[in-house]
Amino acid sequence: MSKEYIGTDCYNRKMELYHIGNEVYCNHIKNGVVVKTNSITVDNRVLGLFGSPHTSGAYIYDEIARMYGKKL
């Protein structure tokens, strides 16, 4: 499991995206401590994006928001 840095949120917290099975998680990190974790169950279309060499975590985050209507 590798965590991918995808940017900062509106509260200036680092965001990391990763998955375990069909569950995608997004950690929000402030001062080195995870302060919030959101998750969503996704299908294989999204999981396939994690293995793509030219696909960024930010793109995956946006695709999840578009497909499922939920921001992590």
Model-based region annotation:
Residues E4-I29:
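Amphipathic, interaction-prone secondary-structure segments
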Residues V34-L72:
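Mixed-charge, Lys/Arg-enriched low-complexity segments
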Residues M1, N27, Y59-D62:
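Intrinsically disordered, low-complexity serine/threonine-rich segments
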Residues M1-E4, L72:
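Short, Lys/Arg-enriched, disordered terminal segments
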